[in-house]
From Swiss-Prot:
Keywords: Ribonucleoprotein, Ribosomal protein
Cystine pairings recorded for this chain: none
SUPFAM superfamilies: Ribosomal protein S16
Organism: Baumannia cicadellinicola subsp. Homalodisca coagulata
Gene3D superfamilies: 3.30.1320.10
Name of the protein: Small ribosomal subunit protein bS16
């Protein structure tokens, strides 16, 4: 099954997450099919904390991909704030 989920990057105690489309059996930070955005929980000032390519996310959902619970919550909050970009 294909999943849309977060892959952790960044340094120790400074997380940075890539939003990726991957096979269910791959490791959290392992091989992925496509990168569809990022999430920076420590963004301050004018730094972008969330960028989503909603066109590609909707494409994968329509083709049977399932989102993680955390990603679902991020997208829901982004829609409320109108922060996401549909272009990428």
């Amino acid at each position: 099954m294909v999943r849309i989920r977060l892959a952790r990057g960044g340094a120790k105690k400074r997380p940075f997450y890539q939003i990726i489309v991957t096979d269910n059996h791959q490791a959290r930070d392992g091989r992925f099919i496509e990168r569809v955005g990022f999430f920076n929980p420590l963004a301050t000032g004018q730094a972008v904390d969330l960028r989503l390519n909603m066109d590609r996310i909707l494409y994968w959902i329509n083709h049977g991909a399932k989102m993680s619970e955390r990603l679902y919550a991020l997208i829901k909050s982004a829609k409320n704030k109108s922060q996401y970009s549909s272009a990428g």
